[in-house]
């Protein structure tokens, strides 16, 4: 087998190995409800543990009669309590006066379907199909109990404001009737950030100690859970400068902490941390105040299948006649890189600055918030590639063309490596006849063959590994490009041309709809039919890989020839259900690689006979059939 074919097998084999290892190490989680699950901690008065960590009250979940449907349409759930509307350019929804929950939030600029008019619902109330909400409150201590502080079912009253907008905050109030008046002022900006100020006024005659907290709770798994090995979905948090992640499947396996009564993980944060849930495109995150210490808690309540993140702040002493307050933030929205970077208030960096990114100091400072986007292992490559793609999309106005342009730029940058690789391959091609003679003369004496080949390489100043190293160096860049295209929010519902109206979805064309000529939908990506009725892009991908093979004659070994003959079509079916934006990248990359290799090989005196190799493969196949 010549070295050029060996390099191609090496690159293909490495891709297969990486995919297989990922699936073996990180299989999709299988969530099975435990019938013997431990119930959440019971409500008690005066909760301050011997560790000094305050406990939050369990979230109230209404009981349903046996055999009843435990979910209800969101409209019904929303009507069960008085509400205050939310109205901003980016989001719409409402806040429930029952518990003061932020539990109804939809994203105005994002739709569930490409041609649909239903906007994405991020947060939903208890009683709906997918309850997901943020809740705030106070943990009591001493003689105070949970009846003395606001909890998840406290009836708040609207004290000021009418509708929550970027220009008009609202204030909720609740008097416990025992000398404590609680207030909650909620503000929102024009993107996705809430600011929640909790205060307590002590009108009684004794000092009280209370600990504020925030909760983000999710009942059950997300309906749009991707479960894809290169994407993190679940808990994301920053603890003293370090980013920590837990998948949804990890939470039930956490150790059961006695004081929590359920599987949980507790971390103390000295300053500038945050915690919440992240999905592929959306995120809901609690952010305590700047330089605020707190306890970061992740837990799972098996009895109700609730995934929960909490930020518990230290106890505060409130003397008679005094008022204490604490301010936290809540991010609930789309993972728009520019918005998240602005909230981080980070300098964009050289690469991002070159492509139009600017610092916005008006939105606070949340350290490492940009890392809530899953940049992957090669983040140092993924980030600049993302900003370049983002800039190209803005400049060109078409994400498909931006992907092709990005591929072209990366190919240009990597040209020196590719040139060395292909020159080395061309030189090895020239030596192939002499290598064959050495094999014949050496026979079964492998030591003699190796010695003769090394002398031949030395005489002709050829490095046999010269074609492999550039390929290996390009692998991290390949994975970074793959990651960028996979996680980029701008790819969602982004059109290219013709039938390609969503680059984040698989190619919708198939023989069923005459490849886009008929309005019939393509098979679901998860179905077996999708493997059979593949679209135009997977076909083009297979053809581009097949043509790339034809730059070289087929291997003389029959087994190797069969493997090479099947590889393009195996990849065509394997990758057919991937996002069409990824296929656009792979097709563009294969086309540019073919062109580069053809021109470089010709410049070195080796003239690839593409059409001759194609004819030869068909003649060989016809002979085998006879």
From Swiss-Prot:
Its main location: membrane. The chain crosses the membrane at residues 8-28, 399-419, 469-489, 527-547, 563-583. GO terms for biological process: protein insertion into membrane; protein transport. Keywords: Cell inner membrane, Cell membrane, Chaperone, Membrane, Protein transport, Transmembrane, Transmembrane helix, Transport. One of its GO terms (molecular function) is membrane insertase activity. One of its GO terms (cellular component) is plasma membrane. Gene3D superfamilies: 2.70.98.90. InterPro entries: Membr_insert_YidC, Membr_insert_YidC_N, YidC/ALB3/OXA1/COX18, YidC/Oxa/ALB_C, YidC_ALB_C, YidC_periplasmic_sf. CDD domains: 5TM_YidC_Alb3 (cd20070), EcYidC-like_peri (cd19961). It is found in: Cell inner membrane. It is a multi-pass membrane protein. NCBIfam families: PRK01318.1-4, yidC_nterm, yidC_oxa1_cterm. Belongs to the OXA1/ALB3/YidC family. Type 1 subfamily. Required for the insertion and/or proper folding and/or complex formation of integral membrane proteins into the membrane. Involved in integration of membrane proteins that insert both dependently and independently of the Sec translocase complex, as well as at least some lipoproteins. Aids folding of multispanning membrane proteins. Interacts with the Sec translocase complex via SecD. Specifically interacts with transmembrane segments of nascent integral membrane proteins during membrane integration. This is Membrane protein insertase YidC.
């Amino acid at each position: 087998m010549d070295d050029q074919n060996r390099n191609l097998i090496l690159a293909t084999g490495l891709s297969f190995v990486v995919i297989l290892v990922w699936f073996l190490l990180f299989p999709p989680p299988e969530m099975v409800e435990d019938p013997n699950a431990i119930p959440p901690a019971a409500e008690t008065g005066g909760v301050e543990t011997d560790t000094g960590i305050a406990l939050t009250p369990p979230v109230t979940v209404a009981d349903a009669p046996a055999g009843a449907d435990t979910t209800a349409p969101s409209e019904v759930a929303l009507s069960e309590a008085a509400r205050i509307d939310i109205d901003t350019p980016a989001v719409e929804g409402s806040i429930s006066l029952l518990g003061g929950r932020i539990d109804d939030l939809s994203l105005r600029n994002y739709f569930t379907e490409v041609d649909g008019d239903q906007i994405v619902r991020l947060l939903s109330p208890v009683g709906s199909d997918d309850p997901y909400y943020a809740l705030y409150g106070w943990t009591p201590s001493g003689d105070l109990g949970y009846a003395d502080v606001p909890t998840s079912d406290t009836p708040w009253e609207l004290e000021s404001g009418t509708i929550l907008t970027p220009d008009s905050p609202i204030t909720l109030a609740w008097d416990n009737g025992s000398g404590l008046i609680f207030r909650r002022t909620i503000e929102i900006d024009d993107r996705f950030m809430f600011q929640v100020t909790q205060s307590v006024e002590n009108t009684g005659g004794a000092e009280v100690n209370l600990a504020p907290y925030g909760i983000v709770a999710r009942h059950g798994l997300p309906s749009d859970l991707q479960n894809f090995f290169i994407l993190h979905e679940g808990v994301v948090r920053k603890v003293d400068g370090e980013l920590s992640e837990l998948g949804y499947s990890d939470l039930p396996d956490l150790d059961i902490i006695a004081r929590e009564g359920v599987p949980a993980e507790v971390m103390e944060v000295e300053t500038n941390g945050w915690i919440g849930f992240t999905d592929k495109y959306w995120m809901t995150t609690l952010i305590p105040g700047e330089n605020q210490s707190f306890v970061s808690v992740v837990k799972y309540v098996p009895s109700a299948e609730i995934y929960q993140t909490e930020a518990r702040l230290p106890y505060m002493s409130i003397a008679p006649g005094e008022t204490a307050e604490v301010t936290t933030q809540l991010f609930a929205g789309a993972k728009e890189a520019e918005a998240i970077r602005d909230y981080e208030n980070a300098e964009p960096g050289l690469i991002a600055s070159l492509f139009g990114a600017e610092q916005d100091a008006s939105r606070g400072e949340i350290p490492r918030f940009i890392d809530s986007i899953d940049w992957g292992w090669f983040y140092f490559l993924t980030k600049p590639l993302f900003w370049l793609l983002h800039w190209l999309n803005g400049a060109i106005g078409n994400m498909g063309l931006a992907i092709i342009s990005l591929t072209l730029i990366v190919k240009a940058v990597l040209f020196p490596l590719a040139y060395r690789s292909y020159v080395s391959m061309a030189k090895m091609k020239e030596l192939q006849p002499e290598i064959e003679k050495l094999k014949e003369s050496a026979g079964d004496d492998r030591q003699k063959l190796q010695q003769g080949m090394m002398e031949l390489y030395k005489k002709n100043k050829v490095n046999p590994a010269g074609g492999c190293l550039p390929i290996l160096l390009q692998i991290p860049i390949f994975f970074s490009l793959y990651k960028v295209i996979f996680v980029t929010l701008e790819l969602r519902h982004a059109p290219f041309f013709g039938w390609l109206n969503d680059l984040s979805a698989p190619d919708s064309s198939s023989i069923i709809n005459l490849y886009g000529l008929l309005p019939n939908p393509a098979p679901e990506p998860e179905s077996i039919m999708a493997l059979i009725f593949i679209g135009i892009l997977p076909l083009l991908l297979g053809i581009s890989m097949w043509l790339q093979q034809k730059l070289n004659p087929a291997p003389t070994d029959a087994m190797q020839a069969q493997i090479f003959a099947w590889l393009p079509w195996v990849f065509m079916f394997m990758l057919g259900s991937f996002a069409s934006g990824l296929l656009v990248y792979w097709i563009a990359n294969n086309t540019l690689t073919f062109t580069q290799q053809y021109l470089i090989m010709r410049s070195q005196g080796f003239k690839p006979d593409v059409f001759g190799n194609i004819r030869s493969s068909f003649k060989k196949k016809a002979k085998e059939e006879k």
